[in-house]
Amino acid sequence: MKINQYVVELWHEPGMSPLSNAASRKMANHTHEVLPGLMEARGMKMIGAYHLDPEHRSILIFEAKCVEDVRDVLYEIGFMHWCDDRIFPTTPLPEMHKWAAAQEPI
């Protein structure tokens, strides 16, 4: 089965930051504890995780069979309690260029 890559952007308001909000900190700690097991159960792998300083934003990069696996993990680990998110399917730039070059221009 083909493994795809997905970029996830997560963000929250400053008042929801685990830095200052005790409930969010508890959720963040729980998230980091359970994430490896949830990913393993779906055959997923995290290949990147970055905080965008000084914003309240993070970028996660996953390898997964389908976008639904990524979505479900985000819900099950609790990110949706304190973060908003966007999930982006990705295409390697050389593949995108080849595809785009084959399209008829306007």
Language model feature labels by segment:
Residues M1-H56, K65-D69, P94-I106:
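Short S/T/G/P-rich N-terminal loop/turn motif that feeds into the first structured element of a domain
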Residues G43, G78-H81:
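Glycine-centered loop/turn motif at secondary-structure junctions
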Residues I61-E63:
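Short hydrophobic/aromatic beta-strand micro-patches
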Residues V70-G78:
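Short amphipathic alpha-helices in soluble, non-transmembrane regions
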Residues M80-P92:
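Conserved short beta-strand edge segments in small beta-sheet-based binding/regulatory domains
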